[in-house]
Amino acid sequence: MFPMVTEFMNYGQQTVRAARYIGQGFMITLSHANRLPVTIQYPYEKLITSERFRGRIHFEFDKCIACEVCVRVCPIDLPVVDWKLETDIRKKRLLNYSIDFGICIFCGNCVEYCPTNCLSMTEEYELSTYDRHELNYNQIALGRLPMSIIDNYTIRTILNLPEIKT
């Protein structure tokens, strides 16, 4: 008779323990119910990127002195700089500059160490294509300024700031 009583006591303790675990999980679920959704309707809503966002690199051809500092500081030696030495003025003349964004890791070293500030990071992050060879940008494509999502009236912008609870 005693084994049956102890089994009923163990069953009761297990039931109470299971109810407590279910209650704890339910409390966590309820604590998340008051939060705003994290997901957005992407093509129609876009987050405003932060000030130091590392997007596509913008290149200004006129400022570049072909010093190749960007190539030396790049961890993967990515920028391709073609130049010609002008002997009469003893300066390098830039012929071609290109970056392959299929390989770029967007570390920002080239932008940080450029002595003439001809490189800068933009807020553009939509670089997907069907052909990987389209990701190889020359100086003309790098010089194109990105269209700001703030100026596009068909896209609703969402400011990504943490809420301050009062």
Swiss-Prot record:
The keyword NAD applies. [4Fe-4S] cluster 1 binds at residues 64, 67, 70, 114. It is a peripheral membrane protein. Its cofactor is [4Fe-4S] cluster. It holds the Pfam family Fer4. GO terms for biological process: photosynthesis, light reaction. Keywords: 4Fe-4S, Chloroplast, Iron, Iron-sulfur, Membrane, Metal-binding, NAD, NADP, Plastid, Plastoquinone, Quinone, Repeat, Thylakoid, Translocase. One of its GO terms (cellular component) is chloroplast thylakoid membrane. Its EC number is 7.1.1.-. This is NAD(P)H-quinone oxidoreductase subunit I, chloroplastic. It is found in: Plastid, Chloroplast thylakoid membrane. The keyword Chloroplast applies. Binds 2 [4Fe-4S] clusters per subunit. GO terms for molecular function: 4 iron, 4 sulfur cluster binding; iron ion binding; NADH dehydrogenase (ubiquinone) activity; quinone binding. It catalyses: a plastoquinone + NADH + (n+1) H(+)(in) = a plastoquinol + NAD(+) + n H(+)(out); a plastoquinone + NADPH + (n+1) H(+)(in) = a plastoquinol + NADP(+) + n H(+)(out). NDH shuttles electrons from NAD(P)H:plastoquinone, via FMN and iron-sulfur (Fe-S) centers, to quinones in the photosynthetic chain and possibly in a chloroplast respiratory chain. The immediate electron acceptor for the enzyme in this species is believed to be plastoquinone. Couples the redox reaction to proton translocation, and thus conserves the redox energy in a proton gradient.
